[in-house]
């Protein structure tokens, strides 16, 4: 189990993660695409990255909008693992 980040640690980490913000015990980013098909192409890339990392975001899809949330459930909050995964997801769609 990883140690959850303190609020100052989390704020520092979020400063380098475009689009991500704290939401409760998670970090979240919202994406907007031109249509449903583009949103699903992105979600499929997210799924591939998540499987490779062994760390899976919560995903909400509403037509062309995708919301991703990352938290380490076993730690009860955001850990370095979530920050690393958010960085990887930003590589897929900056």
Curated annotation (Swiss-Prot):
Signal peptide: none annotated. It is an enzyme of class 4 (lyase). InterPro entries: PCD_sf, Pterin_deHydtase. NCBIfam families: PRK00823.1-2 (NF002017). PANTHER family: PTERIN-4-ALPHA-CARBINOLAMINE DEHYDRATASE. Its EC number is 4.2.1.96. One of its GO terms (molecular function) is 4-alpha-hydroxytetrahydrobiopterin dehydratase activity. CDD domains: PCD_DCoH (cd00488). Keywords: Lyase. This is Putative pterin-4-alpha-carbinolamine dehydratase. It comes from Koribacter versatilis (strain Ellin345). It catalyses: (4aS,6R)-4a-hydroxy-L-erythro-5,6,7,8-tetrahydrobiopterin = (6R)-L-erythro-6,7-dihydrobiopterin + H2O. GO terms for biological process: tetrahydrobiopterin biosynthetic process. SUPFAM superfamilies: PCD-like. Belongs to the pterin-4-alpha-carbinolamine dehydratase family.
